[in-house]
């Protein structure tokens, strides 16, 4: 081959390889930065038991706080009662769904301490009698699960909380407004 063709081929390969390498590195950096934009969700360690303001029926509430600096979307939540069953080959856990009245809000706003309406907090509610359903701490527990996506990055996050002891979990009262899980 002629030296000019070899020089042209080396120059072309140098530019292509360099462009591909730079593209891969910048894409990796972008994904690394973007992957840090995941929802951060806190779930209350206790369940508030109160009366519905309209019907007066007993209502149970689980409060979540979106700690992310952006809104979270595509929210899905579940509450289950898990029960331990002994079988010939060992133990298994069976679950029963507890119906949540508002289990999939469209959005929970970004975390903002200056938000007077506290739109970054949300209360999931059920009218099912948790104290009746959850009748034995030795073989049963409650599990609340939530999945949400970050509104900007699209990355999802899953959070859950297990409630193991009924006497430490269910408290009479209402959650206080704001960035806390206190029951008043």
Placement of each model-derived feature along the sequence:
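Membrane-proximal, non-transmembrane interaction regions of membrane/secretory-pathway proteins
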Residues: 48-182
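Low-complexity, acidic Ser/Thr/Pro/Gly-rich terminal tails and inter-domain linkers that flank the onset
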Residues: 32-56
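Membrane-embedded hydrophobic alpha-helical segments
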Residues: 1-35
């Amino acid at each position: 081959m002629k030296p000019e063709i070899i020089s042209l081929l080396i120059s072309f390969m140098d530019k292509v390889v360099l462009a591909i390498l730079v593209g891969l590195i910048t894409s990796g950096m972008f994904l690394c930065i973007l992957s840090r934009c995941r929802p951060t969700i806190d779930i209350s360690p206790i369940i508030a038991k109160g009366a519905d303001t309209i019907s007066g029926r007993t209502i149970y509430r689980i409060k979540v706080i979106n700690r992310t600096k952006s809104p979270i979307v595509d929210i899905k939540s579940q509450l289950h009662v898990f029960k331990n069953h002994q079988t010939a080959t060992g133990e298994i856990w069976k679950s029963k769904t507890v119906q949540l009245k508002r289990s999939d809000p469209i959005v929970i706003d970004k975390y903002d301490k200056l938000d007077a309406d506290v739109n970054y907090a949300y209360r999931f509610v059920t009218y099912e009698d948790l104290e009746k359903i959850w009748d034995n701490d030795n073989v049963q527990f409650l599990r609340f699960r939530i999945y949400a996506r970050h509104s900007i990055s699209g990355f999802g996050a899953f959070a859950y909380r297990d409630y193991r002891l009924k006497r430490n979990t269910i408290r009479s009262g209402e959650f206080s407004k704001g960035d806390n899980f206190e029951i008043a």
